[in-house]
Amino acid sequence: MGEPTFYFGYGSNLDAEDWAAWCRARGADPTAMVEVCSAWLLDHSMRFHYRSKGRGGGAADVVQDARGTAVPGALFTLSEEGWNLMNRKEGHPNVYHQTPVQVITAQGEAVEAVTYVVQPAQQRSELVAPTQAYAALIRDGLVKRQLPIGHLNSSIKHLDAKSTIDHVFVYGTLTV
């Protein structure tokens, strides 16, 4: 059996209750997605340039950006049914499409994963503000994992906000 394909989740997919409610509404099992650990999608920033009919406002996307930018999120494993459900939830391939990415775990390990990115035809050239409820789902998911929310707050207000990493700590560099 091959190695698992990991899913990098960001945005509302960081909220377990939102995922579970979406699954239950469709008679599906939410345990088809299991969290592994927190992770960062490097050289990307979050954008709100897509209007979700289901959310009634802007929905999160990740876009390739300058070196030193990063989007916090989480790595998950999905069963085959989990991938089918996630594809359906994300409107794959018409709204969001699967994209291979490399993420860095909180432990510093580089991991190959798949995430979902908004199709160019669905992107708007202006900021599409999310609802307060949708932003709260994302914020709560980040806070639960002790991940920063500054990038989220900026991207809600500015289309071209940068999710810049402005500090680095390297283990083993301290001397006594």
Residue ranges of predicted features:
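Glycine-aromatic micro-motifs
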Residues: 2-176
